[in-house]
């Protein structure tokens, strides 16, 4: 475990000795869980290399984490069951309907406080594709806020304001798919093999037809089937939901590492809770409905472990699909 922690050293040099030691202790505590989760990839050397990369991701985020969020981490470590406190009271809303935009939340926070709200879920907040976007769940950029709601600075300000009033901010994080216009998909369409491998693409209908023998249709009326032909890819791409929502290949460790970075970047803006949207669909297995496969739990475990190392105040909430 010390070898894993050593990969973090170059990113922690600017921190105090106490803060560096705290990170190393967390790596030592959670490394076994991380490696067990990464065993999902079926190759010990690959799991180890992925763990090293994730520790580096965690170290960079930890070093950049604001002091007030480090303080929140310390408080949450002292009360690990904080979210199960009977006083916790959640409220979910569409930002534009409730407050107009992120800046408008400050005008409504007194109302939330009177209700006793301690947990605010803003649906969906990240930048979607233009046009049809599945109600905002076809994300074009996970690092940008919907332009009509504000920007990253507005998100940081809103999270800080809410936290000061005792309210934890929750946002949706779509894990199964990205919009066709996402930078990864655009690179894949442009011929970049690295990003093509982020998706499930097939040259002909042989494999898609075999999968579809047991796959239910999510939107049979207006988005039948689970695969879409794309001329630029010259292949059939897996699209569980809509033809503009491309499923990611979570058997590729690079996808896991990308989302670890996204989660920690948003956590450093003050997001405390992530609702993991469409998480049941992450792992594909021939002959099944490709939902709630055991590997999904291991992938979630790996992501959760990275958060526990870099930002232990963060909580995951998985969408249940049964």
PLM region descriptions:
Residues 1-257, 268, 279-322:
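Acidic/aromatic-lined carbohydrate-recognition and catalytic surfaces
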Residues 274-278:
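Extended, hydrophobic alpha-helical segments in both membrane/secreted and soluble proteins
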């Amino acid at each position: 475990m010390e070898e894993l922690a050593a990969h973090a050293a170059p990113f922690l040099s600017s921190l105090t000795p106490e803060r560096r030691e705290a990170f190393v202790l967390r790596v030592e505590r959670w490394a076994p869980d991380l490696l067990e989760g990464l065993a999902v990839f079926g190759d010990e050397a690959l799991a180890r290399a992925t763990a090293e990369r994730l520790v580096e991701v965690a170290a960079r985020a930890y070093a950049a984490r604001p002091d007030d969020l480090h303080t929140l981490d310390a408080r949450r470590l002292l009360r690990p069951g904080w979210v199960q406190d009977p006083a916790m009271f959640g409220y979910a809303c569409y930002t534009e309907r409730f407050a107009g935009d992120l800046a408008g939340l400050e005008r409504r926070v007194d109302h939330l406080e009177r209700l006793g709200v301690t947990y605010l879920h803003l649906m969906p907040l990240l930048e979607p594709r233009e046009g049809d976007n599945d109600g905002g769940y076809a994300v074009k950029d996970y690092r940008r806020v919907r332009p009509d709601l504000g920007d990253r600075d507005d998100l940081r300000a809103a999270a800080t304001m809410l936290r000061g009033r005792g309210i934890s901010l929750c946002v949706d994080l779509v894990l199964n798919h990205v919009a066709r216009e996402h930078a990864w998909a655009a690179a894949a369409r442009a011929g970049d093999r690295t990003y093509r491998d982020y998706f499930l693409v097939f040259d002909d209908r042989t494999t898609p037809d075999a999968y579809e023998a047991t796959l239910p249709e999510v939107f049979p009326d207006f988005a039948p089937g689970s695969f879409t032909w794309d001329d630029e890819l010259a292949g059939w791409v897996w699209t569980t939901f809509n033809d503009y929502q491309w499923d990611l290949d979570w058997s590729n460790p690079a996808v896991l590492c990308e989302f670890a970075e996204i989660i920690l970047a948003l956590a450093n803006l003050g997001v405390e809770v992530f609702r993991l949207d469409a998480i049941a669909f992450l792992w594909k297995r021939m002959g099944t409905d490709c939902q709630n496969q055991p590997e999904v739990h291991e992938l979630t475990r790996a992501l959760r472990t990275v958060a526990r190392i870099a930002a232990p105040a963060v909580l995951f909430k998985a969408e249940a699909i049964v």
